[in-house]
Amino acid sequence: MNAENTGSTSEVQLDNGIFRVTRWTIEPDGVIPMHRHDYEYVVVPLVTDSMHVRNADGSSTVADLKAGVSYTRAAGAEHEISNPDGTDDVVFVEIERL
């Protein structure tokens, strides 16, 4: 799936009603538009890089990713993810507990 030519693509690898596993790729200057996570989730970075996170309240931060080092976020997170300064794709797997 391409998020309307925003430079981000997603591929659902598994959705069994308990977990949804999605591989995301954000190209240089690409963005995953503002979205809300309805479920608790784990992110498994496949690259060592950084991405920009803009939250719904307007605050922003840089998330440093290390390949293979997972992190989790609570349900309700609402943000936009981008790769504005990247020269390579940012790639990660997102695992949602449905």
Regions found by a protein language model. Give the residues of each.
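Ligand-binding loop in jelly-roll beta-barrel domains
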Residues: A75-L98
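N-terminal first-folded block
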Residues: N2-M34, D38
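Short acidic-glycine-tyrosine-enriched beta hairpin
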Residues: D57-G76
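Short, conserved beta-strand element in jelly-roll/cupin
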Residues: R36-H52
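Residue-level marker of beta-strand positions
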Residues: V31, S50, V69-S70
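Short beta-strand His + acidic residue motifs that chelate non-heme Fe in jelly-roll/DSBH
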Residues: I32-M34, H52-V53, E78-D85
